[in-house]
Amino acid sequence: MESPNRTTIQEFIFSAFPYSWVKSVVCFVPLLFIYAFIVVGNLVIITVVQLNTHLHTPMYTFISALSFLEIWYTTATIPKMLSSLLSERSISFNGCLLQMYFFHSTGICEVCLLTVMAFDHYLAICSPLHYPSIMTPKLCTQLTLSCCVCGFITPLPEIAWISTLPFCGSNHLEHIFCDFLPVLRLACTDTRAIVMIQVVDVIHAVEIITAVMLIFMSYDGIVAVILRIHSAGGRRTAFSTCVSHFIVFSLFFGSVTLMYLRFSATYSLFWDIAIALAFAVLSPFFNPIIYSLRNKEIKEAIKKHIGQAKIFFSVRPGTSSKIF
């Protein structure tokens, strides 16, 4: 009896978007600006790190990798949000599974990478003499690849299980993109589905709590070392090295924790969407700002390249002919 019902739903319809054309346009314009800023801002960071050899250090290698992940993390959801605001609000069942997979896989990659970055800061401040011999370029590459492997493997069992569930009721998804809990609510309710929802909650809890504990352990050691530094300038330098990462960590994990560590707690649709926007849109939006405005070396490198671009474009067409 399940197979006929299962095939009745071939697509989901996002019902959380405004139906008014004016409201849709009002939402579309800032979202388009934010997405463009995220892509361009992160591409600038990647390019600046690649073009400046003095930035080829573990910290900037990880920042560059995080910027690359941010582009794909937002691309998994925002383009579909933009099209849903102005046109068709449906997504195929397979498309929904793919969106969930890439959104969560890139998100888990970021969680792992933020944890690795905290460990990198810990080594740089707590073991500065051994740091160059430990955090080699080879190890940086291995850690980055390990984060990606972990991220792209972890969601596979959940996605595979959801693909086997029967969906025999409403296909109206009360969310702005495909996510585990909103999709699971549309599955035909049975004991197995209820138990698996709880299992998904536990999996998310383990992932988030493990990462948060490791990061806080790293920062606990960092703070202890910083407090032992006698020079105020030295303390300021050491603190500024970590503050950008900690702000990014707080923004991302704060909203993710509210969304995925609620267990039986329920929010209104408004708060569900607000929290989802916080970690899917706003957190990636602030990351390029934090890493560029709070990082002296990246700011100086960007200014240098802007200056070079101004010189290049200020050369008049007749100048080259005069040289020859």
Curated annotation (Swiss-Prot):
GO molecular function: G protein-coupled receptor activity; odorant binding; olfactory receptor activity
InterPro entries referenced in this protein's UniProt entry, alphabetically: GPCR_Rhodpsn, GPCR_Rhodpsn_7TM, Olfact_rcpt, Olfactory_GPCR1
Glycosylation sites recorded in the entry for this protein: N5
UniProt keyword Lyase present: no
Membrane topology: Multi-pass membrane protein
Classification via SUPFAM superfamilies: Family A G protein-coupled receptor-like (SSF81321)
Extracellular side stretches: 1-25, 76-98, 160-198, 260-272
Gene Ontology terms: cellular component: membrane; plasma membrane
Main location: membrane
CDD domains membership: 7tmA_OR6N-like
Residue spans, topological domain Cytoplasmic: 47-54, 120-138, 219-238, 294-324
Keywords for this protein: Cell membrane, Disulfide bond, G-protein coupled receptor, Glycoprotein, Membrane, Olfaction, Receptor, Sensory transduction, Transducer, Transmembrane, Transmembrane helix
Residues annotated as transmembrane: 26-46, 55-75, 99-119, 139-159, 199-218, 239-259, 273-293
Taxonomy, superkingdom: Eukaryota
A single BP term in Gene Ontology: detection of chemical stimulus involved in sensory perception of smell
Disulfide pairings: C96-C188
Subcellular location: Cell membrane
Family per record: Belongs to the G-protein coupled receptor 1 family.
Known function: Odorant receptor.
Protein name per its UniProtKB record: Olfactory receptor 6K2
Taxonomic lineage from the root: Eukaryota, Metazoa, Chordata, Craniata, Vertebrata
